[in-house]
Amino acid sequence: MVDAEMAAFGEAAPYLRKSEKERLEAQTRPFDLKKDVYVPDDKEEFVKAKILSREGGKVTAETEHGKTVTVKEDQVLQQNPPKFDKIEDMAMLTFLHEPAVLYNLKERYASWMIYTYSGLFCVTINPYKWLPVYNAEVVAAYRGKKRSEAPPHIFSISDNAYQYMLTDRENQSILITGESGAGKTVNTKRVIQYFAVIAAIGDRSKKEQTPGKGTLEDQIIQANPALEAFGNAKTVRNDNSSRFGKFIRIHFGATGKLASADIETYLLEKSRVIFQLKAERDYHIFYQILSNKKPELLDMLLITNNPYDYAFISQGETTVASIDDAEELMATDNAFDVLGFTSEEKNSMYKLTGAIMHFGNMKFKLKQREEQAEPDGTEEADKSAYLMGLNSADLLKGLCHPRVKVGNEYVTKGQNVQQVMYATGALAKAVYEKMFNWMVTRINTTLETKQPRQYFIGVLDIAGFEIFDFNSFEQLCINFTNEKLQQFFNHHMFVLEQEEYKKEGIEWEFIDFGMDLQACIDLIEKPMGIMSILEEECMFPKATDMTFKAKLYDNHLGKSNNFQKPRNIKGRPEAHFALIHYAGTVDYNIIGWLQKNKDPLNETVVDLYKKSSLKLLSNLFANYAGADTPVEKGKGKAKKGSSFQTVSALHRENLNKLMTNLRSTHPHFVRCIIPNETKSPGVIDNPLVMHQLRCNGVLEGIRICRKGFPNRILYGDFRQRYRILNPAAIPEGQFIDSRKGAEKLLGSLDIDHNQYKFGHTKVFFKAGLLGLLEEMRDERLSRIITRIQAQSRGVLSRMEFKKLLERRDSLLIIQWNIRAFMSVKNWPWMKLYFKIKPLLKSAETEKEMATMKEEFGRLKEALEKSEARRKELEEKMVSLLQEKNDLQLQVQAEQDNLADAEERCDQLIKNKIQLEAKVKEMTERLEDEEEMNAELTAKKRKLEDECSELKRDIDDLELTLAKVEKEKHATENKVKNLTEEMAGLDEIIAKLTKEKKALQEAHQQALDDLQAEEDKVNTLTKAKVKLEQHVDDLEGSLEQEKKVRMDLERAKRKLEGDLKLTQESIMDLENDKQQLDERLKKKDFELNALNARIEDEQALGSQLQKKLKELQARIEELEEELEAERTARAKVEKLRSDLSRELEEISERLEEAGGATSVQIEMNKKREAEFQKMRRDLEEATLQHEATAAALRKKHADSVAELGEQIDNLQRVKQKLEKEKSEFKLELDDVTSNMEQIIKAKANLEKMCRTLEDQMNEHRSKAEETQRSVNDLTSQRAKLQTENGELSRQLDEKEALISQLTRGKLTYTQQLEDLKRQLEEEVKAKNALAHALQSARHDCDLLREQYEEETEAKAELQRVLSKANSEVAQWRTKYETDAIQRTEELEEAKKKLAQRLQDAEEAVEAVNAKCSSLEKTKHRLQNEIEDLMVDVERSNAAAAALDKKQRNFDKILAEWKQKYEESQSELESSQKEARSLSTELFKLKNAYEESLEHLETFKRENKNLQEEISDLTEQLGSSGKTIHELEKVRKQLEAEKLELQSALEEAEASLEHEEGKILRAQLEFNQIKAEMERKLAEKDEEMEQAKRNHLRVVDSLQTSLDAETRSRNEALRVKKKMEGDLNEMEIQLSHANRMAAEAQKQVKSLQSLLKDTQIQLDDAVRANDDLKENIAIVERRNNLLQAELEELRAVVEQTERSRKLAEQELIETSERVQLLHSQNTSLINQKKKMEADLSQLQTEVEEAVQECRNAEEKAKKAITDAAMMAEELKKEQDTSAHLERMKKNMEQTIKDLQHRLDEAEQIALKGGKKQLQKLEARVRELENELEAEQKRNAESVKGMRKSERRIKELTYQTEEDRKNLLRLQDLVDKLQLKVKAYKRQAEEAEEQANTNLSKFRKVQHELDEAEERADIAESQVNKLRAKSRDIGTKGLNEE
């Protein structure tokens, strides 16, 4: 873009792109590609430098600061050439590395170009100053521009998202991320500004402004100041930091028109309301109010303008240099006005804000001698209570003495000062948070419009990553959110991108960018993660922050790499744990986390809030439900659950919703970078920026953009869009596959063919190539358009020339005609022609114009209706697309639920393992306790033995004492000694008894402990036994199924030879089952047909009854009318005879008078004949026009209806194909996921298989039932449509007849009036006749003119109709071409998906085939296992497909229900039309009566005329000629009178005929309505029956295999019962047929009676008595017929009940057969699973063997290395010995030299200085050599030591490898044992499958027999039917 093109950006141009001059200067700058480099630097990360020299892998360079550095060569990175300076897309850099990206951003930032593209996303750096790049001029310049056509900007990202939304018809999202202070909020505002301005530009003509409110665009923009005032605050890093997250969705209509908007907010930082750090401040709204810009606010809120008067808002800073609080207050207040807030709402918000400030000033103190708090002054409490609409005393009482519920009673609790202060802060935070949420909801209400919306663009602005000195719970939530968003970015940019390459079959090596953050996310949110433990601790009443910390340490310290113990630094707040986030390590302080998470409130004060007189406050807390709130019935559970939800759980729920929304959109990423910590404009802190670039994945994103293919297009779209580049590459006439066409097209273009790749469904382009193709396309289009314009100009010029020639010819003709006219204009006959000619056409054309106008009006209404219908269809299509998006969201939610279920399953498996470990530990403890118990029992026995010995000693002593009592005196000394011994013994005994007691107590304690432990062990063993039993049952069932499967496989191999024939047999079984299902459906259909016929006969009987009643009523009416007609006719006859007599007398007189006026009479007759002819022509023309208009109207309506049906069909086809496409994609995903799941866990697979089989059976039954109901509904709909069409056609015919009759009536009345006027004129005078002649001529002229006008209107109408038809044809072709094209594309996608699926299956088979190289003996078994794995995958895919098809069927059923409701509404409307027609019929009757009255008046007037004629005859008696003329007039009048009477009679007859038709139509309407209601009831009953059947199927599936025998016996019993029921049904049917035959006879007789009645009606004048007798006969027969019909109805109901019973039993039998078949298939699937496990184990064995071999090779290599090292060591030792020898030699030489030196000294003393100098030089050389040799010797010693260490390491490694080899060998042996065990299990499963197969065949045989019997019974029923028909026809013939 040159400077002239940049002029469109105005003053923003230099801030967006380099000028041409700068580019030229950069290109001429000196640059050496080999010397100009980047080198690393400690402070600046990297600096520019020039290479001075290169030596030995090191480079010496001079930096740009003049410093010389030496670095390794691999640390030196090349600079890019000067033309890449300040490049707009860093993906285009030649050398892509960290310093290149850093310096490009730095240089652009220095020129204030803050936006830079980085591959697929945009990087922006906060300028910390205002730049003129956001004005309206810049917005207009970016509108509609491609990304490559304009400089990088947030507006370009926004416009691209907008264009993608319109072209791809997909929701978009713009994710603006970065650290706090990086400029996210400003960029969010700019995005919203762009969309608002674009919408305003595009919709200025239709913009409407509500009074008091702004436009929608203004409201969207003004939502920001309001949100910022209440949600933004100053932080350490940002003066205007958003302390909440927001996701703004801007909704657009189908055409891109702005429709509405809504805002979702996340995680408002409530704690800031009452606490701020020193360098921060509270939310802006507090300081805006205190700015005194609106003094009335200070008065209203009872506050001063000093922030330091209020404790809550003055803990940090109170002013910000970059923010003018006064101006911001006015902006906030104005925003409220624009958003439509009322003054009451605004004042309420200000009052609550002021009340929070007063809350912070409330003080409390301890009561004397008590620990309870009391208010220390009530002034602030009074103010806050006044502002909140509360009672101050109640507020203070609620704070100091809240009421707490204890049991069922409320108790007043005393609070200390600390508790009261905490409650005050919590209430202030809760009020502020709820007020903020209410404000967001109120804004959303304002932004919600009723305009249709289809797509949205979401803008996410959420708090950036935060690392403060003091990080609490809020920082954890914010950082966790940023982790999830960064993971979403990484997954979208790196994982999904590369996975798509693999799916599309592009050669691609997966690049691991090391950006997986899942470990940190799992640590926070997974079960037993940080938030889970926090929520668990909140559940326990005695939990504290320290117990929470202890649990964290127990679960994660040392176990998770992201969880660390923090290092507490002096001067910083204490930290309790540290987390390693993607942006750095954060130390968290957990003080108060439990309280913050539970967020408790003082419920006494909350109750006061609910009763507040301030409406806003009471609304905020109206729905608050605390722990003590009484629960209402029916709502208690919901309220309790919602009130207990913690802050962390709510945040996770909102975050998951946000991530789901983002996944359903196409994301655009904007990375905001903070340049420095000091907020200095233009300064880049290199380490800070590099840290952000690394964390944000900027470099990785550029690399994958460079290496990968960021642009991709479907083959069909590419071919359609770029075929224009070379049309010859794709021939027009022949069909070429889209992929081949794209390959040919790209191969024929002059581009780099390495820059693109062909996938399965898309063509992939490297960065920049698609832009080149777009440029080529634009050039090609411009050339084509230029050529078209040239050709168009030529055609237009030729047309203009042709017009000039035609104009010349026309002028010549006109001149010739004028000359001819001038020659004849004075001719008298021509003058007469000029006078008469205009008069002929005027009247006729006026009438034609009137009719044409009416016709035009009708056609216009029809056209408007068709347009409305088209709009409805378009709206319906939009709603269907919306439903598709909703379904995609539901599918995404279902996938998330599935993932959660898998995680829970994994957790359960882990819990099982832990429980088993605990059980093992408890059993070990039990064994220890038992050993201790045994020791104690042994000690106890020993002590008991000692006690018994002591007792025996005591007994002996007592005996001796008794013996020596006699010798007492003699043996006193002995007694004393003995007593002393006794005392000692007693003491010993006492000690022993004490010890015994202690031991007994210890023993008892041990027994108790043992009993407790035994109880625990029993419970654990019970649990273990249950688990083991469950596991054993599962394993037993698996083993049994494996045995059955093995038996089956052996049988199949014996019978068919290989596994493929087995699959064919399974397919045969399925085909048999399908045939059985089809036969069952056929039987059901035939039974339904029988029921329908019976019901039709019932309906016919009821209709006949109704017709009889109506005919009776009609007969009575006809009798009355006949009587009236007789009297009227008698009067008319009498009048006619009188008139005839009078006319005869007049004729006699006239004959005498003669024929004086014969000439006038002849002229009159001619005029009358001409008049009649013109009138007939006019009537014929009008009839013809009406017929053509009706035909055209009908044709137009049919075409519109046909188009509507075609559109519906095309939409259904499109939806079906799209669903099939998504299903194929999901099936492919399911195949891969099922493979992974099979490998992961056997238990998981078994469970999933069972559920899938159950679902498959359920869905299959549902699908069949749904298909039946859908077929019924379609047939009903078709029938109703045909009936409706027939009725509408009949109504049209009736309308035509009625209009014809009304026209006839009008003509007759007109004729009567004309006759009257003519009689008066002829009687009065001859002059009146001349006047009448003139008026008749004038009338003729008017009629001709009217006729001409009508013809012109007709032509105009035909033109309009042809135009409408052409538009209809255009629409039809458009829809057909679009649909065909879309269908072809979807078919191609379907084929490609099928090909991909087939390729995936082939790849799986190939991978499985590789495993067959284990051993030759296992080859056959391995192949079978692989095939079975394929079967498992197919069954899973089939189950998933059935599940999806079931959902599709449910959706189709809902659509049909909707269509049925629409047809019901159409039926009601047609009934309304019928009623309106009946009212019109009554009007016609009234008109007919009025015409009769007019006839009477005419007759009276006729009498008067006759009297006048008699008077005239008396006057003209003298003239015979006059009499003759009057005689002629009399005859003429008589003839006209007869014609009038006949016309009147015909009109009466036609009216009666029309009345009969209308009555019949009403009857048919009523019958249709009754039939529809009956069918609806039947369908409801069938659906209910299907529901019950489904429940029965579920119950039957839940029963075990043990019920199989019972089901077989039940089947036999049912079979017998069915046979009996069939016999009974045959008897009942024969009886019903007899009754039906009799009813038919009676119907025929009734029909004959009706015919007689009709004849009697025609002859009612002659035979009134006969008619009465026939009516009596009809009444008697009608009563008989009603009685017989009642009996017939009872019989039909009985047969219906028996048929339903038989049908139900047949369904149950088929369900049991299906159950057996599903069990068989489940056994087969389980066998496949076991064999898959076997193959997995074999692959593990193979891997282990391979590892063993690798280890052996490593050991060999290590041994060879050791040998080599030993040789080297030996060499080193030899060299060392050689050096040692050399050293000794050198020492010897030194001694010799020393000796020589002595001699030399002596010589020197003797003989000269020169010799001395030489010797000294030689000594120095020798000393140098000695030093060098010593150094070499030391180095050789070091090398020897290194080699010795290397030898030791190698020997140790060989020993380790040997041990690993032994372990692997043991593992191989174990795995082989498992393989053998699995083989045995597979054989047992095969045996069981054989038994089930035999049972299935037996049941199938029984089912076949039952069906044969049903066929026999059906044939008998058909015979009986035929007989009944024959009997009925015979009866009719006899009658």
Swiss-Prot record:
Residues bearing PTM Phosphotyrosine: Y1308
Region (Actin-binding): 655-677, 757-771
One of the GO biological process terms: cardiac muscle contraction
Keyword Cytoplasm annotated: yes
UniProt-annotated binding residues for ATP: G178, E179, S180, G181, A182, G183, K184, T185
Entry-linked InterPro entries: Kinesin_motor_dom_sf (IPR036961), Myosin_head_motor_dom-like (IPR001609), Myosin_N (IPR004009), Myosin_S1_N (IPR008989), Myosin_tail (IPR002928), P-loop_NTPase (IPR027417), XRCC4-like_C (IPR014751)
Residues with N6,N6,N6-trimethyllysine modification: K129
GO molecular function, one term: ATP binding
Family membership: Belongs to the TRAFAC class myosin-kinesin ATPase superfamily. Myosin family.
Note: The cardiac alpha isoform is a 'fast' ATPase myosin, while the beta isoform is a 'slow' ATPase.
Protein name per the record: Myosin-7
Organism: Sus scrofa (Pig)
